[in-house]
Amino acid sequence: PTSHGVPSCGWLVQQHAMPGKFDRVRADELELNAKERALLARGEDVIGEDGSALEARWFRGGERAAVSVLFSGDTAAQPPEWKPSVSPTLLIHEATFLSEQQEKADEHMHSTATGAVASALSVNASVLALTHYSNRIKSSNQSEQEATAVDTDLPVLALNDNDRLVVDDDGTVTHLRWEKEGWTPTSIEPNR
C-alpha cells in the first residue's frame, strides 16, 4: 500500500531464489548419460553404472539470490504500511518535489528525492530509481543530486521518459538511456 490522498498502489514483483547452474562440463567429464543428467539436474542423487554415488549438489553452483522490484505509485515518503516480505533489489519511487518544497509534498502526500531515499532505506532496497517529477523540476539530475547528497551508500539513479531498467539474476541493475546514437547502458552494482 501507498500513502496518498487519492487511491494509489504499489507492486512488488519477485523472482524467488533459484538453484545454481547445472555443471554440464563436470557431467561431460564423467560421461553421464541423459537420464543421469536429468535426475541430477532435478536435484536427485544418482547411483552410477559402476555403483558409485553421485550427489546432485556436486553438480550445482551456489544458489542464486532472490531478486525483486518494488514499484511505488504516488505516495508520501515511508508509508507506514510498507512491510515487504523481502528487501527489494530495486525500488522505483516517485520524487515529485525537491526538499525546498517539502510543505507542498506533505500537503499533497507526495515525496521529495530525500523522502524517496528514506523510503528506500526503510525497506532496505539495494538500488533506488527516482521517477514522477513535478514540472517545477527542470532536470531529473536535480532530484538525483539531492538524493545522492544524503549520506548513504545507496546507489541512486534518476529515470526519464523512455528509459529502461534491467535487473539481472545477480541483482545488478542496468539503466538504459536513449541518446542520439542509441541506448547508453549504465550498470549499477547493488549495495549488498
Where are these regions (language model features)?
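Active-site-proximal loop/helix segment associated with metal-binding centers of metalloenzymes
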Residues: P1-F71, T75-P84, L90-I92
